[in-house]
């Protein structure tokens, strides 16, 4: 099995190192990751400038081929597939921080898996709750390996990827979940530069309902959350009603 490993925290993150080294148990591994932090960039693809794709031996992957890209996580997957050959599995992470609920819409970690899935490759995004006193990437990587092995052996339906979140503590087990309403309520902080001109930081505080059976509910109770995510964003349940709503509409 050939496994492409990427992330959004950058190639020097301890999370991608743990994930990449763990994946060696499944076969041939190659790492393609951003050369700097790319958190919250979403599924952006770089089309207005050239990209650099450089081999690196300084990221701690040993004999695993590793490449750094001055682009987004999705860029990394595109270049990895086209320059290094099509993998059998794409894994992204392990992200420093959870990607729950509506986080998926801006997560670079999930975007790498989305790109893999859009190319028809079974793909998984892994994220770790960093609210604990110790970040146990090794334990998360053990679970990631077990999940990746199952997907590698049994496959995923076309157009479906997995979004996996690990709790801050040692996992009690694994639960298959649905997405929660977890999100960040944006806050805009205004400050002044030395010339007295305003500049802004966008921050946010976590919000959302902790409903039973959701990813947020599972992770907060110490379980590994595994959520199937579909590339098809159509609101199928609203199609018929929308036809009625728009009946007779014309300029």
Curated annotation (Swiss-Prot):
Stated family: Belongs to the SurE nucleotidase family.
GO terms for cellular component: cytoplasm
Function as written in the Swiss-Prot or TrEMBL entry: Nucleotidase that shows phosphatase activity on nucleoside 5'-monophosphates.
InterPro entries documented for this protein: SurE, SurE-like_Pase/nucleotidase, SurE-like_sf
UniProt EC number: 3.1.3.5
Keyword field: Cytoplasm, Hydrolase, Metal-binding, Nucleotide-binding
Compartments in which it is found: Cytoplasm
GO-annotated molecular function: 3'-nucleotidase activity; 5'-nucleotidase activity; exopolyphosphatase activity; metal ion binding; nucleotide binding
Catalyzed reaction equations: a ribonucleoside 5'-phosphate + H2O = a ribonucleoside + phosphate
Cofactor: a divalent metal cation
Species of the source: Thermus thermophilus (strain ATCC BAA-163 / DSM 7039 / HB27)
Protein name: 5'-nucleotidase SurE 1
Cofactor note: Binds 1 divalent metal cation per subunit.
Enzyme class: hydrolase
Residues annotated for a divalent metal cation binding in this entry: 8-9, 39, 95
